[in-house]
UniProtKB/Swiss-Prot annotation:
InterPro entries: CIDE-N_dom
Protein's gene: Cidec
Record field: catalytic activity: a triacyl-sn-glycerol(in) = a triacyl-sn-glycerol(out)
Residues covered by the CIDE-N domain: 41-118
Stated name of the protein: Lipid transferase CIDEC
Family of this protein: Belongs to the CIDE family.
């Protein structure tokens, strides 16, 4: 009997409406409190420098988080900088715009005095700098190379190859084969002896010629003296 009365009390409209109201309040409280507990998910993005030489991957929850990580990674503490889109140079200043961007967006860090430039402009500027710094092309008129090598390990000097190139078009080479050390010494002594003999013959010929010249001058002087004494003696006799 008591069990039946309790069942009827549960089915009473007031208790039923009260139970539904409490359940609705709990569900509403959960739905309201859940969004407040949610935090923005970390979004992958990439950051590059103004010259596009350095590119880093960063996970950031918000624009403020991204700015702080960029400052730490690129060591920009106490240095003013701004973030722009790498593709077109649009400035990223608000959180709403940052959240509206797709994942893996590439940002560019611009420091004070730097401006956004397209990749084509940067390539053009690099090409101009390389052309201005490139040295003028020089044309070789003549080039001579010497190559010393040995055909036999016992060779003293070996062989010498001389190669000459004119205007990078015409070339001429010559191989000079040297003899062994003994043959080189013999040839040197032979040429030395020949030069000494030739020098001796020259000295002998020169000395004989000088002797003949001196003898001839000495013979002329007495004859002239005798010819000058005859007129003087004749005058004295008269």
């Amino acid at each position: 009997m008591d069990y039946a009365m309790k069942s009827l009390s549960l089915l009473y409209p007031r208790s039923l409406s009260r139970h539904v109201a409490v359940s609705t309040a709990v569900v509403t409280q959960q739905l309201v409190s859940e969004p407040s507990r949610e935090t923005p998910r970390a979004r992958p993005c990439r950051v590059s420098t103004a010259d596009r030489k350095v590119r880093k991957g960063i996970m950031a929850h918000s624009l403020e988080d991204l700015l702080g990580k960029v400052q730490d990674i690129l060591k920009l503490k106490d240095k003013p900088f701004s973030l722009v889109l790498e593709e077109d140079g649009t400035i990223v200043e608000t959180e709403e715009y940052f959240q509206a961007l797709p994942r893996d967006t590439v940002f560019m860090v611009l420091q004070k005095g730097q401006k956004w430039k397209s990749p084509s402009e940067q390539r053009k500027k690099k090409a101009q700098l390389s052309l201005s710094q490139k040295p003028t092309k020089k044309i070789d008129v003549a080039r001579v190379t010497f190559d010393l090598y040995k055909l036999n390990p016992q060779d003293f000097i070996g062989c010498l190859n001389v190669k000459a190139t004119l205007y990078d078009t015409y070339s001429l080479s010559y191989d000079l084969h040297c003899y062994r050390a003994k043959r080189i010494v013999k040839e040197m002594l032979r040429w030395t002896l020949f030069s000494m003999q030739a020098t001796g013959h020259m000295l002998l010929g020169t000395s004989s010629y000088m002797q003949q010249f001196l003898d001839a001058t000495e013979e002329e002087q007495p004859s002239k003296a005798k010819a000058s004494l005859l007129p003087a003696c004749l005058k004295m006799l008269q």
